[in-house]
């Protein structure tokens, strides 16, 4: 898996195997159709070093916005880019906004924006 890390942005190659997608669909009782269920992309976030800073912090996911241009297929390699959109201190809360963009051959497939908060 290739990795490219830049301040506030990280790029990785990602893939969803046929077996793991079938297992996910079976677990959640979803019909398997050789496409990756959108919410399965949640497994990608911890793979990014940029997101590792949250591993020991008590953060709360407040919002998720998903824009799908093209469904992800199993056993295909995609380029996933995680970037920090913003970080704001509001009283005793830090609001983090991250965006995850998934592309295949320079074609935009999916964009996931998530907002997390950390209470200090």
From Swiss-Prot:
It comes from the Bacteria. InterPro entries: UCP032370_VraC. This is Protein VraC.
């Amino acid at each position: 898996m290739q990795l490219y890390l830049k301040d506030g942005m990280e790029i990785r190659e990602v893939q969803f195997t046929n077996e793991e997608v079938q297992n996910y669909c079976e677990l959640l009782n979803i019909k398997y159709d050789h496409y990756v269920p959108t919410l399965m992309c949640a497994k990608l976030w911890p793979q990014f070093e940029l997101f590792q800073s949250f591993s020991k912090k008590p953060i709360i996911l407040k919002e998720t916005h998903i824009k799908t241009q093209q469904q992800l297929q199993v056993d295909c390699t995609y380029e996933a880019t995680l970037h920090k959109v913003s970080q704001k201190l509001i009283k005793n809360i830090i609001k983090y906004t991250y965006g995850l963009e998934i592309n295949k051959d320079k074609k935009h497939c999916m964009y996931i924006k998530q907002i997390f908060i950390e209470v200090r």
